[in-house]
């Protein structure tokens, strides 16, 4: 099987939906947040811990795994699931975003992208066909088309030309994809331009994919601009296919994205800020390494029931982070991922009760106020 997507409920006051995404490695309740495991590991977390916090699917990075240890080695190991001992669903990105982030080290051609490795300067080439080959060897349940990712801001003409190439590449990706146990998603581009987003959606629907992602957001544009693009893009997307907003993971953005009809999200934010001693709480972000928490013997978030908040204090975690102890990063990462996955569970509950706007208002009132931190 590849995947199937069933819509279970549409919220009456918003565009939010409840869905069930079926994959060869299990079912996913949407809307969902996907922890990022760039190097075939969610940094500092074991697969058992990810299951404990109810992670349903994780994301890995094609670019990094292509460079190290190599997709052929992972294929030899039986694919990503066996290699990393994670038997639930996996999504791999195409590597496009990372390659196009190497602005001084890459050259774009119609056939693909030539680039130099950020590790050792070695020269490489990735085409749409190569990106699909790598992802077929990695063996994820959901894989992504290879797209061109314009920087923000970019002028209209550049984005228009880039979009046309992305559509041509999407066709090549679909033609190259041969694994029936994988689903290939197309990626909508078009920058902040309404007509280009519309053009992108229509072209990808014409090619035909089992799911569609919104790319090119959360790349430096203002929050209001991102929401505006979602407002005019999501309604154009097929109702009966999963909708994936790439690279978005701040709690407030997850809520707003779901309200606009998005089903899937991923972001390195929760794990990245955790490594620097910042955590999500019901009252907003908290930087536990700050001196004010040296003698604070309360949990990171008194309203959280995760393992970390039940067993450790801000003072202790601050001590670990300041001393650069590995356990400190493990605890902050565990808490942050639990916080987001728990938030998504609450969002799904609110959609079921047709009460998402009330949930949003109450959540943001506390989260953005930060009065008690």
Swiss-Prot record:
GO CC annotation: cytosol
Catalytic residues identified in the record: 93 (proton acceptor), 266 (nucleophile)
Residues binding Zn(2+), per UniProt: 304, 306, 309, 335
Region (RNA binding): 247-253, 271-275
Molecular-function annotations in GO: metal ion binding; tRNA-guanosine(34) queuine transglycosylase activity
UniProt EC number: 2.4.2.29
Protein known as: Queuine tRNA-ribosyltransferase
Entry keyword set: Glycosyltransferase, Metal-binding, Queuosine biosynthesis, Transferase, tRNA processing, Zinc
Cofactor note: Binds 1 zinc ion per subunit.
């Amino acid at each position: 099987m590849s995947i199937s997507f069933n819509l279970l409920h549409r919220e009456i006051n918003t565009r939010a939906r409840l869905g069930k995404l079926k994959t060869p490695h299990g079912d996913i309740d949407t809307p969902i947040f996907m922890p990022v495991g760039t190097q075939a590991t969610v940094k500092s977390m074991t697969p058992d811990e990810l299951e404990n916090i109810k992670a349903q699917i994780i994301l890995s990075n094609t670019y990094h795994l292509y460079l190290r240890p190599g997709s052929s080695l992972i294929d030899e190991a039986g694919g990503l699931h066996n290699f990393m001992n994670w038997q639930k669903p996996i999504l791999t990105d195409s590597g496009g975003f990372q390659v196009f982030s190497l602005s001084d080290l890459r050259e774009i051609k119609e056939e693909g992208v030539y680039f130099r490795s950020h590790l050792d300067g070695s020269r490489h080439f990735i085409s749409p066909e190569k990106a699909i080959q790598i992802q077929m060897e990695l063996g994820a349940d959901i894989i992504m088309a290879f797209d061109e990712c314009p920087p923000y801001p970019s002028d209209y003409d550049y984005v228009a030309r880039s979009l046309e190439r992305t559509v041509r590449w999407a066709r090549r990706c679909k033609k190259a994809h041969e694994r029936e146990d994988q689903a290939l998603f197309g990626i909508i581009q078009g920058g902040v331009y309404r007509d280009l987003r519309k053009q992108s959606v229509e072209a990808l629907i014409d090619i035909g994919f089992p799911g569609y992602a919104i790319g090119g957001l959360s790349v430096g544009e203002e929050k209001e601009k991102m929401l505006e693009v979602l407002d005019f893009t999501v309604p154009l997307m097929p109702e009966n296919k999963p909708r994936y907003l790439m690279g978005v993971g701040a709690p407030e953005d997850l809520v707003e994205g779901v309200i606009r009809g998005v089903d899937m999200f991923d972001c390195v934010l929760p794990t990245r800020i955790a490594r620097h001693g910042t955590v999500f709480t019901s009252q907003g972000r908290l930087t536990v390494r700050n001196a004010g928490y040296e003698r604070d013997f309360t949990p990171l978030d008194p309203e959280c029931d995760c393992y970390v908040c039940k067993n450790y204090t801000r003072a202790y975690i601050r001590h670990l982070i300041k001393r650069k102890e590995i356990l400190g990063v493990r605890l902050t990462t565990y808490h942050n991922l639990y916080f987001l996955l728990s938030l998504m569970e609450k969002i799904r509950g609110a959609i079921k009760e047709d009460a998402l706007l009330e949930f949003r208002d109450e959540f943001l009132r506390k989260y953005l106020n930060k009065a008690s931190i």
